């Protein structure tokens, strides 16, 4: 076993993060940012479990047909445009054939069209090139500020701060991480 190879006990290990997120009541955009493995997703899910954007299901031949019937085509296309997804030919394609950047924008539009007051979007701009990240961040920032919604981007790229213009930032690299173990470990 791996544990035996490194002379490790099978006792439970817990990792606890200690830190504070300070923000005023009137914020609209927040950013949780840090390197991989620093607890961003864990923190976001713990603090905002009901607002966490998960994978949406897109099954139709046209992305436009994946939205609820009570949402008008005009609302959908305005929201698409507001997040920088401004290609009518692409609106007619199924989600599965869209680029990662287009998928990110469709997911952002989908979350904006829901009745949720808070949107927590994990892996924000993680799978897109930095130019698409810049355009997408700026577009979502403008779209959110036109609403009464709150948006939290969770991601590993620090550059989005300049484009997203968050009201608050929580950098997980500044966390104090406490390891709690029920036994002592040593590696041979």
Residue ranges and their predicted role:
Residues 1-24:
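Pre-NBD coupling/linker segments of ABC/ABC-like ATPases
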Residues 120-129:
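Walker B catalytic motif
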Residues 94-99:
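Conserved ABC ATPase signature
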Residues 128-136:
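Short alpha-helix in the ABC/ABC-like ATPase nucleotide-binding domain
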Residues 17, 21-85, 156-164:
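ABC ATPase nucleotide-binding domain signature region
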Residues 115-117:
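A residue-level structural signal marking coil residues immediately N-terminal to beta-strands
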Residues 108:
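Hydrophobic anchor residue at the start of the ABC signature
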């Amino acid at each position: 076993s791996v544990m035996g190879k490194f002379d490790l006990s099978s006792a439970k290990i817990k990792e606890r993060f200690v830190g504070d997120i300070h923000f005023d009541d009137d914020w609209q955009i927040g950013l949780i940012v840090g390197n991989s493995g620093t607890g961003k997703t864990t923190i976001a899910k713990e603090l905002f479990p009901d607002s966490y954007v998960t994978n949406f299901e897109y099954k139709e031949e046209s992305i436009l047909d994946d939205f609820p019937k009570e949402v008008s085509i005009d609302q959908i296309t305005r929201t698409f445009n507001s997040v920088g997804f401004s290609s009518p030919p692409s609106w007619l394609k199924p989600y599965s054939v869209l680029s990662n950047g287009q998928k990110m924008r469709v997911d952002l539009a989908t979350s904006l069209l829901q009745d949720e007051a808070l949107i927590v979007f994990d892996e924000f701009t993680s799978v897109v090139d930095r130019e698409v990240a810049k355009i997408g961040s700026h577009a979502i920032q403008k779209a959110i500020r036109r609403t009464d919604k709150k948006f939290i981007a969770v991601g590993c790229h620090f550059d989005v701060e300049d484009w997203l213009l968050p009201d608050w930032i929580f950098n997980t690299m500044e966390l104090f991480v406490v390891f709690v173990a029920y036994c002592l470990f040593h590696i041979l």
